[in-house]
């Protein structure tokens, strides 16, 4: 599985409010428990004052990520980038040195 940084920003205050309602509903209906085994969340940060957030996940594919994030896609700009943690970064640097 690959680690990814997901960054998102709501397009406006109305979309942020609607997204918040969707998040509460998802959470209260067991959303966390019904994530696929091929999707793990390591950290999640949301700055409510400006409608932006970031999370670091491990997933088997971008398809898995987009299936989970699809409901919010029209409400916010979402970017997904591969990333590494510190140990992975150090390991990669060591492998690429002569």
Positions of PLM-derived features:
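Conserved, structured core segments of small domains
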Residues: 1-98
């Amino acid at each position: 599985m690959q680690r990814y940084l997901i960054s998102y920003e709501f397009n406006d205050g109305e979309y942020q409010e609607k997204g918040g309602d969707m998040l509460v509903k998802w959470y209260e209906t067991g959303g966390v428990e019904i994530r696929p085994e091929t999707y793990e969340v390591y950290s999640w940060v949301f700055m409510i004052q400006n409608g932006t957030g970031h999370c670091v996940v491990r997933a088997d594919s971008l398809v898995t990520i987009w299936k989970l994030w699809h409901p919010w896609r029209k409400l916010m700009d979402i970017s997904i980038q591969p990333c590494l943690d510190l140990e992975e970064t150090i390991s990669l640097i060591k492998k690429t040195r002569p």
